[in-house]
Amino acid sequence: MTLWPKRPIIYEINTRVWLNELTRKHQRPIELSCVPAGEWDAIAAWGFDAVWLMGVWERSLIGQHIARTTQGYLDDYRRALPDYTLDDVAGSPYCVHRYVVDAHFGGTRGLAAARSELAQRGLKLLLDFVPNHVAPDHPWVINHPEYFVQGSRDDLSRAPNDYFDTYGGHILARGRDPYFPPWPDVAQLNAFNPALRSAAIDTLNVIADQCDGVRCDMAMLMLNDVFDRTWSNRAGTRPNVEYWREVIPAVRGR
């Protein structure tokens, strides 16, 4: 593979939607390992430098339940797609249960096959990383609650939309942008926690082994100034080094 151009042209594909469309088009189940060669050829013919397969990671069942039962979301679906059904609602691709390729898409082997097809056509592969939050059923919630912004019983009583009970002895904050209400389907990671930063590096190394570049969702939320403004005294001691200045070199230099 050649080096990245200075200003790459990237084609985003909603992986779930695309595979469903191909399944209907070809009238057989299509996952990443068996996308017809002509489909890859058509993408390559457009002259892009890379393909971003958005949303390949395992989605959360809790997140899916929230997406299927929150009235405001249901109203939005109906306005956008009057004929939608609940089977169409898979949950947010940014509510990541685990950084494992979803079995519905062909799993790790399917992704490797897709990457190979792209490489044969001179295209690079981008995948997602969500540094700010994970799903409420991500293994870290139970195994490493210290990675998250913590709350108290009083916080939960005062602001039940801002916090949730893990039922493992911890109250955690829901993920958020400082200018909007919290997202109901994710848990807020603590960018100031050294152990979380180390775990993020490990996660990124796993992702990097499977692609040529990473698209980092809501990357600005991990900046010290932004995180401090959002979480102030709940985040602990502000580090001297920015999150990305610690994480990116560690992944690039491995």
List the model feature ranges, each with a label:
Residues 1-254:
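Active-site and adjacent substrate-binding regions of carbohydrate-active enzymes
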